[in-house]
């Protein structure tokens, strides 16, 4: 869900690295082509790449590389969550950004206790969902 004038769509978390379980890239974009080259380079040349970073997991690395391209036209699918009142100590947009974005109309993200339950908890919803799946 990005338009041709966008380079990247992702599920952000304000003040923290994004949720990288889902993102979209405009592969015709020169900025994205350069982003992907750098993203691969930091893994292929780990001694001069990810091993120089504070954290090595995909979401952190993704954010570090994304920040190297400030001209990238980005769409943060979870930006609307940043204005919601978070629980004490929470990062804005954290929790379950996928189901609270437009993607929640089609996708659920099951891991941990949600995987055992077979669906996300109603308490995970921060926005009203009208789809039958969520009723």
What is each PLM-predicted segment?
Residues 1-14, 24:
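GT-A fold catalytic core of metal-dependent nucleotide-sugar glycosyltransferases
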Residues 17-18:
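Short, solvent-exposed loop/turn segments at the edges of secondary structure
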Residues 27-135:
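A glycosyltransferase accessory/donor-loop signature
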């Amino acid at each position: 869900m990005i338009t041709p004038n966008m380079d990247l769509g992702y599920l952000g978390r304000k003040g923290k690295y994004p949720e990288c379980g889902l993102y979209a890239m405009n592969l015709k974009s020169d900025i994205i082509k350069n982003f992907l080259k750098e993203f691969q380079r930091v893994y292929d040349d780990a001694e001069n790449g990810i091993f120089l970073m504070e954290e090595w997991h995909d979401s952190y690395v993704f954010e570090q590389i994304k920040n190297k391209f400030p001209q990238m036209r980005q769409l943060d699918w979870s930006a609307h969550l940043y204005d919601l009142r978070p629980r004490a100590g929470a990062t804005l947009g954290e929790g379950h950004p996928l189901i609270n974005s437009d993607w929640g109309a089609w996708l659920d993200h099951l891991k941990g206790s949600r995987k055992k339950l077979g669906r996300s908890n109603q308490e995970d919803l921060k926005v009203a969902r009208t789809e039958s799946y969520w009723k």
